[in-house]
Amino acid sequence: MTAFNSLFSLDKKRLKKLQRTLNTINSLKGQMATLSNEELQAKTTEFRKRLVNGETLDDICAEAFAVVREADKRVLGLFPYDVQVIGGLVLHQGNTAEMKTGEGKTLTATMPLYLNALEGKGAMLLTNNSYLAIRDAEEMGKVYRFLGLSVGVGVSDNEEEDRDAATKRAVYSSDIVYSTSSALGFDYLIDNLASSKSQKYMPKLHYAIVDEADAVLLDMAQTPLVISGSPRVQSNLYKIADELILSFEEQVDYYFDKERQEVWIKNQGVREAERYFRIPHFYKQSNRELVRHLNLSLKAHKLFERGKDYVVDDGEIKLLDATNGRVLEGTKLQGGVHQAIEQKEHLNVTPESRAMASITYQNLFRMFTKLAGMTGTGKTAEKEFIEVYDMEVVRIPTNSPVRRIDYPDKIYTTLPEKIHATIEFVKQVHDTGQPILLVAGSVRMSELFSELLLLSGIPHSLLNAQSAVKEAQMIAEAGQKGAVTVATNMAGRGTDIKLGKGVSELGGLAVIGTERMKSQRMDLQLRGRSGRQGDIGFSQFFVSFEDDLMIESGPKWAQDYFRKNRDKVNPEKPKALGQRRFQKLFQQTQEASDGKGESARSQTIEFDSSVQLQREYVYRERNALINGESGHFSPRQIIDTVISSFIAYLDGEVEKEELIFEVNRFIFDNMSYNLQGISKEMSLEEIKNYLFKIADEILREKHNLLGDSFGDFERTAALKAIDEAWIEEVDYLQQLRTVATARQTAQRNPVFEYHKEAYKSYNIMKKEIREQTFRNLLLSEVSFNENGDLQIYFI
């Protein structure tokens, strides 16, 4: 057990306990091997009975792990190593296991998934993409089925397939489900748009293991999953706003802080806009849409870079995943930003649709009773994992020692120097036949390096968002002798790079990074492509003072150094800066960048807390209606509330001479078009009783017509009101966040401003739901068609 020695000294208390459990599991190895297949399979029923009789998962953990270990050997021919068992124990505890590339995370997960599925509440493994989910479910599913558990797959290899509720219900009722994080998120949102029990399929979220946990739970945490609905009225302001913004001068008409990624219109820009549009007051309420479009255009031009944040493919804007450079198919920026980028690129501006429902990964995964994660790089973000998800990160030792050499960065003053030095280094390594993975920070830079390699006569493959369809083939060939692969950071995660014949003797895979990424974890992922399962290899990064990392997060003295020395260097004779302070500088700058990323994610949580509270409230009320339970939007209760509120309004705000008009208008707008006048002499109590009488008569008539279907009618009326109000609220909250963020330039706390306005909007939404339900119940027309189906027409 020497592999644990160094780790024990760092994390003695945590791993000693795991070691004791591992010893117990190992002691059961012989016993499990003597069992017949039938006896081994019978253990599942035994475990479930023991749980019913009061034992806990921890009580049966060692024995259950030993059972799965033996099943893995019999079914797959693979017996999990001790380090994989340790990883499985960490996952069972609801923590994140940091396991290096090639250490067998897929097999590791079989043990905690089996154990946690025994409770009958469901266990999920969520991967990065559909291919991995389907592959792992097929391969590992053999083990679970051998042990008597059912396995479901939440995704399909046919992207066009639209699964119905019954199919999804069968998937999610399985003991173990393999899916992707995005598929789960969208299924959750769709499930909460259901209008009847038959359309619902999602169980309570119990236990999940998230693969590439740091990428999903941290890096993608700020990206909401959004279901879009009906389009907004198409705006013609995008083009006008774009034209004006192009005439603006940076730091004169608008302020741009690249380090903080903030941009806003200054007073001079406001005056220019007022002159351009011939309006006296730019920020007047009537100019709200104009102000919004100008800010959107400004963001599109300054905060989103082609080749880095998005690509243009066949006339469409396609977003890039910041964590891996891959295209986010089917994903669009919300709130009009996407349309502003389309205008910036002179493309057809697509309709801006309203958000019907949305949720962030943070809030989705915080709904699980127990959450675990697997990743190759999580330890450096342990503090954030603990604060956000209450998950520790445990570094699992490798089964074989890591033999990769990570060389210190080669640091240059200017970008041209760095590029020249990188190409020369690639030539030297390529001459030895050693395979090379050259990683650039953006699509644009990857294409530049590709052109320079072509000019140097070095054949290579180019892997970026534009060529992702060939990814599997390129990665499979990247470890072959003489191979050179130029890629964006999408090469950092995914399929393992296996060394070809004779490559180990040449020194293994050479990973050459052309800049430090915004997060140390991304660099560690890239380094980890070399040295898989004890393979030999090395990594070398080339950096400069002109890299995005240094421009956005570097200290002032570094910027001063660059300005002072940039004209003193010869790009064709690059000179590396060897002083220790420069090595320290890039390390500290990356740490600062990591800190900014953490702060931004923390702010996302703060912003999203309002949305989450409202979402929980709306979904709870919807489910109460669907399940026939009493809730705040019980139709009977709403009749009383709306009429009582109207009477209170008459009593406090309406003059006596306007009373009849107000009552008649209320009846006509909300209750009935067959208006019956009221007497001037009627008291408020008599008016109240009169309104209740009208409501009772209308509902009695509908009840007589609908019979047993009347309950369905009431529920549908309330659900329609909730959904319409919630769609408006989700859309409004997205717009509000954009406005609130801009307000921090006025020395206001954007989160406080957002919560204040969101709370107002929340109360308005609840009032609107009650009033619209009232209208739906009374003003709607109901009938049965010739097939006997209920038809409801809401006004």
Curated annotation (Swiss-Prot):
UniProt: ATP binding residues: Q84, G102, E103, G104, K105, T106, D496
One GO term (biological process): protein transport by the Sec complex
Membrane topology, record value: Peripheral membrane protein
Main location (coarse class): membrane
Keywords from the named record: ATP-binding, Cell membrane, Cytoplasm, Membrane, Nucleotide-binding, Protein transport, Translocase, Translocation, Transport
The reaction(s) this protein catalyses: ATP + H2O + cellular proteinSide 1 = ADP + phosphate + cellular proteinSide 2
Pfam family, one: P-loop_SecA
EC numbers: 7.4.2.8
Broad EC category: translocase
GO cellular component: cell envelope Sec protein transport complex; cytosol; plasma membrane
SMART domains: SecA_DEAD, SecA_PP_bind
Source species, domain of life: Bacteria
Subcellular location: Cell membrane; Cytoplasm
UniProt GO molecular function: ATP binding; protein-exporting ATPase activity
Task performed by this protein: Part of the Sec protein translocase complex. Interacts with the SecYEG preprotein conducting channel. Has a central role in coupling the hydrolysis of ATP to the transfer of proteins into and across the cell membrane, serving as an ATP-driven molecular motor driving the stepwise translocation of polypeptide chains across the membrane.
Assembly: Monomer and homodimer. Part of the essential Sec protein translocation apparatus which comprises SecA, SecYEG and auxiliary proteins SecDF. Other proteins may also be involved.
Family membership: Belongs to the SecA family.
Protein name as it appears in the record: Protein translocase subunit SecA 2
Name of the gene encoding the protein in the UniProt record: secA2
